[in-house]
Amino acid sequence: QGKNFQRLMDEVFPSLVRSIEPCKIGDYTWALQNYYMYLRYAGADWQDIKQQVVPKALDAFAVFDKILCYKENTWHLTHIESPEYEGFQKYNDSNYGLASLSWLLQTLIACHDRTSSTHPDYARWKEILTRLAPYPTNENGLMIAANKPLEKSHRHYSHLLAFYPFRLLHPDVPENRKLLEKSIEHWLSLEDGKGLAGYSYTGAASLYAYLGNGNKAYERLAHFINKPIGISILLPNTFYVESQGKNPVIETPLSAAASLTELLIQSWDETIRIFPAVPDHWKDCAFHALRAEGGFTVSAQRQDGRTEWVSLTSEKGQPCRIQLSGWDAVHQLSAERT
């Protein structure tokens, strides 16, 4: 299905993005991030990524440019949404918009840095990124937007995109970890979670997996599968519907599948993480031929709470860095350089 998505993005993204209301540009940037990640997992080289991603990113940035405002040495976003809070109201400096623009700028810059190429707007991208408004926060963590705290329970974690899936704020930085922990707990507990739906539980599982908290990630996935999930119904075949069965929602079971694999393997910040968030009771577990950024397929086995072996194959011959807990040495058993 990745190829179908890639083809669809190539065919319709430019025309769609040029016709939308600027307040919705974050949605299309998120779609572009999925497209970019597909290329990264497929092992595309940076020249190919630049060729395929940059034209679409430039179209998206042109829309952001319409709602950028410079004030007191800071770039701000005006009138942008934070799905699906308060019925798609528009806000200034929504965390959803700021994270989307930040990812877009960082990707444009990286594509040119990695290919040693230039662009007339390169300096401007860097200047906007450097002076972009900080993510609005309060005592409960990340807010919806500037002057708009998260005060109502709702299903979407759109205000947390800087953590996941964009991974702009890394949890190995202590202040980032504290911010994410506080933000997740507030989002899930607000009004006893009355606005949560299936997507909330799968998203929370991914956020906890990003923190390396396998127990809480598993707890959220188990709730999704076994307990009431608000307006949602999970069917035995993993098909998922909302609104008393009227609305099929394919992204939720796909999100659940992603959450499950993220307990076993994650690849971000140029590092492949093996068993980064397994719950304590998964003493014995294994996975086979899961993909990682850079065109790698990875298999591994864990027994009695310890990783026994890891098998990694590079489809493109690119180097990689692996993070394993509990190993003080690595022994290569294969004769080939893979």
What are the residue ranges of the model-derived segments?
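Primarily short, surface-exposed interaction patches in extracytoplasmic proteins
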Residues: 1-4, 12-16, 39-59, 66, ...
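Short Gly/Pro-enriched turn/cap motifs at secondary-structure boundaries
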Residues: 22, 90, 153-154, 288-291
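Acidic/histidine-rich catalytic neighborhood
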Residues: 58-111
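Short acidic-glycine loop/turn motifs at beta-strand connectors
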Residues: 71-72, 302-305
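C-terminal beta-sandwich/jelly-roll accessory domains of carbohydrate-active enzymes
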Residues: 304-338
